[in-house]
Regions:
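Acidic beta-strand-to-loop metal/phosphate-binding motif
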Residues: 60, 112-118
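Short active-site oxyanion
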Residues: 35, 87, 108-113
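Short acidic, Gly/Ser-rich segments with clustered Asp/Glu that frequently serve as metal-coordination loops
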Residues: 53, 58-71
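Short, basic/hydrophobic alpha-helical segments
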Residues: 48-49, 97-109
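A short alpha/beta connector and helix-capping loop motif
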Residues: 69-87, 94
Length: 145
């Protein structure tokens, strides 16, 4: 059985980039978020979240949007997810709006925001309120390298 740690595979002492088999994946322990999750529904709360997150060096980033099933149909994001090392914020952007402090946070190049294929999410958020994204890292691109 292969042994794992938070930093990668342990064995010969070096981290390997080999593909994991289904058996290896199924042998991994299940993990889930155990920290606080905050639901944000007002502009004031969204501004406070932006202020809180602006003290971080790294944020997790994602959005959730209603799926479209017809050609040409599209919807705006309903949820902006921001995660620090210790807490998660679920911002209901249709209720709170893309307040200035949130736009400033998403534009700040000094704070790394990591997500999977964030360009689509960012384009959708920019339809709610214009801003120039800064500091975003696409984890799917990094995973392919």
């Amino acid at each position: 059985m292969t042994e794992y740690s938070e930093t990668g595979m342990i064995g010969s002492g070096a981290i390997t980039t080999k593909r994991l088999s289904k058996e290896d994946i199924n042998a991994l322990p299940l993990a889930y978020w155990q920290g606080p999750v905050h639901l944000i529904a007002t502009a004031e709360e969204a501004a406070a979240v932006a202020q809180r997150c602006s003290r971080e060096q790294l944020l997790g980033f994602d959005t959730e949007t209603r799926p479209a099933f017809h050609k040409g149909q599209k919807f705006i994001p309903s949820l902006l997810q921001l995660a620090t090392e210790t807490e998660v914020f679920l911002v209901q952007v249709q209720a709170s709006g893309m307040v200035g402090p949130l736009r400033d946070l998403l534009a700040n190049p000094a704070i790394t925001k990591a997500g999977v294929a964030p360009s689509f999410d960012l384009h959708s958020l920019q339809e709610l309120a214009p801003f120039t994204p800064g500091g975003f890292v696409d984890l799917s691109t990094m995973a392919r390298q």
